Amino acid sequence: MIDPQLREGNSVARLLARMNREAKDAGVPARRIHLVFAIDRLLARLLVSAPADSWVVKGGFANQLRRPDDARFTQDIDLRIAGTIDTAPMLVADAFGTDLDDLFSYGSPAPPTPLEGPPGGGLRFLAVAQVAGSELVRFKIDISASDALVGPQESHLSDPVLTAVGYPRSSFPVYPVAQSIAEKVHALTLPRDRENSRARDLVDLVWFAERFSVSSSELIDAAVATFAIRADHPWPPSLSTPPASWAKPYARLRTEVGLVPETPDDAIAAVSTFLAPVFAGARGLRWDPTAVAWS
């Protein structure tokens, strides 16, 4: 149930005023809050329209659910589905067609496009979120099938900003930390025909290492499964020196999420320390982000 006052008078103006106030107080662009709401309310629909355990949040938005105050902001949503990729259009259509009486509605102006990479195939949908019939924001929904998923899913609540504006928080299924790290390791080390431009993968790995305790055994299991199903380069991989072109994007993202390493070279050194026992297959250890060490 949303705050009844949001339904009084001009509901669009009232909701936008509240969201924009929260954005101003947080010192972030209003679009950021609009996206958080649009993605959250879509996921809330999936909780109703799709069977339990048929989907899970992964990627950047999973990290925002874990730590909304300092995760790298993402402008889209990544989902892994339990079924085959051909079931994704119906999953999305059912969510779009679910009415939660929350002022939001969803549609798409174009058919989905294929994604390269996911072992079971992937589709990208363009979602248009509307509030009381007026467009609020657009965002991408990337859906993959058959990605490795080792270990129990986590459950995380909506961003607290939902409550501040007058909406209930939901609890969403989220990729395990170890699986999220394994996918980042795979993305960072993936051989490419051109220069790797994904400085964000390095940023995310440092972010994980500075904030989460994780078992080396869980990381090894998740990584081995990920590399096996992707089958594009062997496990364990090697870490390369970051390209010089990463200096500016790394500096910007470092400021956004609050990382210790000052440069990409410092960051890759930190990641090397974090991953060395994992690459070596050393089980039974636990990472301590405060001590920055395994024990």
Where are these regions (language model features)?
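Structured mid-to-C-terminal alpha-helical surface segments
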Residues: M1-W55, L65-S295
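Glycine-rich beta-strand-to-loop/alpha-helix junction loops that act as flexible
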Residues: V57-F61
